[in-house]
């Protein structure tokens, strides 16, 4: 195996996650009680023995850069190799932003040269999965491919959300369509690629000089390689757990899968650990009057109420008489006494008063954005404060940084929203 360098695409805005990504990039979104989404890709790298990693940031990079730091939690603080944050290059003839996924890697060819790359892994930093990249690389080398794309079969009705490929009997890709309205196959790209470096360099330079390209791997680079027969691309079929948590519903579902009696995604595998940078906190405390079942409760949490089928992050406090069901409550959120929360996602550093009810009543279409907020789930943005005695229905949205005075009424009907007043 040649020298492998991983390039993690971590600049995504994640607009379909609504208020959850208003202030942070999608790869920085908290997940699973203590992690951020990028932790899974970084952990897969080090568990696969890949210690040369570039993280390509763009949209709101501050939280992500602070989280990764010098890479110590992932054993990536190394003199030889390690992790490097790669923001867009700003020069006299360059824009401040990467123009697409392919352009992002193109702008960092120098980083690949400096690290003597022979094979380049191009990875998304916002999916939840466990993969030994050596299996992908071994398959790539066995086939003598120029590039190999990890893929899996998805339900045909969902296929139009993915890059879809058609292969021959040998596994060679003969056609690729990015998010086709009428898919001819259900073999979906996972956004995980390995390329021979010299081949990748050549096609990226060609793509950069193409005025008609949007400089995206799925939309432009991969289809052109196939269309013009520029190289051999193979499909590596992955049969493990992989989730695209790019919508509010899929994010909520993937979190709650973790509390199933036999979860499809194992956070506890001693042979494939997931690492993160998190604050040191004392053990979780469950009070004598508290009741908990089928939940993840992270360190530093204090539970004085009832928690069922939920994911409770670090430093969360749940007051006496409060009931939390089917919900995701993120770091350092405080919930007062005698509250009721069901089917709710609450972001970081939220303060919820006493006697607050959330996720109650009949479901209704979102008045804010029905394409993003598709029903059932009520979402609260980070750094918000919800005053005492407020009743909030289903499919409601509380924006980022909302203050008590932003609530014009004590009862928010299902589908309604509260946003912070513009200063």
UniProtKB/Swiss-Prot annotation:
Family annotation (InterPro entries): ADP-Glc_PPase, ADP_Glu_pyroP_CS, GlgC_bac, GlmU/GlgC-like_hexapep, NTP_transferase_dom, Nucleotide-diphossugar_trans, Trimer_LpxA-like_sf
TM stretches of this protein: none
Catalytic activity annotation: alpha-D-glucose 1-phosphate + ATP + H(+) = ADP-alpha-D-glucose + diphosphate
Binding-site residues, alpha-D-glucose 1-phosphate: 98, 163, 178-179, 189
Catalytic activity, EC: 2.7.7.27
Enzyme class, spelled out: transferase
Example GO biological process: glycogen biosynthetic process
GO molecular function, one term: glucose-1-phosphate adenylyltransferase activity
Coiled coil: none
Keyword field: ATP-binding, Carbohydrate metabolism, Glycogen biosynthesis, Glycogen metabolism, Nucleotide-binding, Nucleotidyltransferase, Transferase
Stored Pfam families: Hexapep_GlmU, NTP_transferase
Biological role stated in the UniProt entry: Involved in the biosynthesis of ADP-glucose, a building block required for the elongation reactions to produce glycogen. Catalyzes the reaction between ATP and alpha-D-glucose 1-phosphate (G1P) to produce pyrophosphate and ADP-Glc.
Similarity field: Belongs to the bacterial/plant glucose-1-phosphate adenylyltransferase family.
Subunit description: Homotetramer.
Protein name: Glucose-1-phosphate adenylyltransferase
